[in-house]
């Protein structure tokens, strides 16, 4: 996967790329999109975009797959500085990208906030759970690939240009306590241009520095400095001062 991923935006559909295709082909394309649920996705995206801005803005600030389960409390804040794409992401791997995976879930509890600080893509099956009075901020050009989970009880901040792979889990809370009085919830901070490999897990209290790489399957329990590569469970430094190529 690379930053070359073609994200599917609210103002562009796959078939629009073939604007010069013959009339019959175009109608076939439209019919295919309607049958595949694209029309429903646009309707749902219009609803969320209007709810966000209070009027219809083009291009739509929110583009959401119709299957996405949205649950945003009345007192919650959804802030989108540029655009949020949910449930659509075509990778260069395979012919069908990541279509057909699980539905997305976006949940923001009472008083919670989800702040999208630019253009952010959440791939199919990604679940974003922001608890009551909790805050999740995601920076410009960051993307999260299929089936990852961002679980926020207190505060999670993800910088810009981050690549978060498949099946990653970020949790700022343990949910339960081992020792009485011990802190089981602490802020997670992910810097800019961080690459988090598939099936990695980032636990409470961790800060990851700019440009760091988290290897596939790593369980990160301690801070990672800028430019480090960490791997394993618990994650240990395996390389330093790297520059990964998007
Ligand atoms: C992090 C990663 C990119 C590093 O690649 P690399 O620079 O070629 O690293 P190396 O293969 O030189 O490995 C360096 C050391 O870390 C270890 N290591 C690398 N990845 C590891 C992993 N996922 N888990 C445990 N150890 C790992 C290697 O065994 C090696 O150990 P050694 O020095 O004792 O031999 C790569 O290991 C990785 O995790 N790739 C998967 C990325 C991914 O999930 N992509 C999905 C799409 S975004």
Language-model-detected regions and their locations in the chain:
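Domain-scale signature associated with acetyltransferase and cell-envelope carbohydrate enzymes
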Residues: 2-169, 191-193, 226, 235-239, ...
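Glycine-rich hexapeptide-repeat left-handed beta-helix
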Residues: 160-246
């Amino acid at each position: 996967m690379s930053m070359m991923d073609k994200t599917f935006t609210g103002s562009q559909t796959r078939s629009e790329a073939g604007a010069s295709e013959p009339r019959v082909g175009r109608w076939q394309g439209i019919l295919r999109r309607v049958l595949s649920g694209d029309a429903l996705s646009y309707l749902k995206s219009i609803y969320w975009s209007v709810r966000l801005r209070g009027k219809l803005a083009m291009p739509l600030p929110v583009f959401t797959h119709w299957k996405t389960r949205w649950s945003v409390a009345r007192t919650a804040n959804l802030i989108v500085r540029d655009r949020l794409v949910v449930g659509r992401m075509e990778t260069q791997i395979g012919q069908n990208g990541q279509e057909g995976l699980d539905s997305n879930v976006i949940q923001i509890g009472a008083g919670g906030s989800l702040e999208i600080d630019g253009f952010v893509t959440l791939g199919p099956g990604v679940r974003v759970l922001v608890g009551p009075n909790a805050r999740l901020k995601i920076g410009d050009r960051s993307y999260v690939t299929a089936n990852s989970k961002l679980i926020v009880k207190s505060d999670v901040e993800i910088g810009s240009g981050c690549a978060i792979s498949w099946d990653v889990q970020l949790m700022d809370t343990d949910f339960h306590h081992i020792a009485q009085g011990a802190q089981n919830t602490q802020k997670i901070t992910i810097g800019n241009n961080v690459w988090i490999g598939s099936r990695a897990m980032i636990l409470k209290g961790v800060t990851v520095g700019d440009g760091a790489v988290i290897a596939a399957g790593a369980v990160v329990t301690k801070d990672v400095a800028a430019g480090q590569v960490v791997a394993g469970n618990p994650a240990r430094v395996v390389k330093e001062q790297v520059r990964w190529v998007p």
